């Protein structure tokens, strides 16, 4: 997606050979016009997949997930990282390790919102080692729902997440596939 590539080149900051900072437009400050384009693109890619729900993890996946849900006309569910007083019933949950935060947390969704009749699209901001995606897939499977595909805003292709998801037979659509961050330069797989 050229608009996303341009934004990454202009506003993304390479912190290391492993870390790309995109807080100027995606995971701290959000560019609504770019999120609309991202939602349009994911909706076009998955329009014939019978999606009934979108699932993401709070917080950075919420903006692209909402725009995709708006386009597809389906609800968006975000897995919560912190349990609240209102989220108390037998939760669907999984443990996820954050590559950038170097922490492990439990994410959860209420079973009231995800059922065995759902065809679910996972939307996330990044795909690196695939831990967040695998956690969401686990939650979807606990509900007996079907994973219809995964929409990733930025994929770090040099890490193993994509290969693992491909090996499991999941459809993965990434809008920006980063080949390398070596030397402080973002190189894309075109």
UniProtKB/Swiss-Prot annotation:
Pathway: Purine metabolism; XMP biosynthesis via salvage pathway; XMP from xanthine: step 1/1. InterPro entries: PRibTrfase_dom, PRTase-like, Pur/Pyrimidine_PRTase, Xanthine_PRibTrfase. It comes from the Bacteria. 5-phospho-alpha-D-ribose 1-diphosphate binds at residues 128-132. Keywords: Cytoplasm, Glycosyltransferase, Purine salvage, Transferase. It catalyses: XMP + diphosphate = xanthine + 5-phospho-alpha-D-ribose 1-diphosphate. Its main location: cytoplasm. One of its GO terms (molecular function) is xanthine phosphoribosyltransferase activity. Homodimer. Its EC number is 2.4.2.22. It comes from Pseudomonas fluorescens (strain SBW25). Converts the preformed base xanthine, a product of nucleic acid breakdown, to xanthosine 5'-monophosphate (XMP), so it can be reused for RNA or DNA synthesis. The lineage of its organism: Bacteria, Pseudomonadati, Pseudomonadota, Gammaproteobacteria, Pseudomonadales. Belongs to the purine/pyrimidine phosphoribosyltransferase family. Xpt subfamily. The keyword Glycosyltransferase applies. NCBIfam families: PRK09219.1, XPRTase. It is found in: Cytoplasm. It is an enzyme of class 2 (transferase). One of its GO terms (biological process) is xanthine metabolic process. GO terms for cellular component: cytoplasm. The keyword Transferase applies. This is Xanthine phosphoribosyltransferase. Xanthine binds at residues 20, 27, 156.
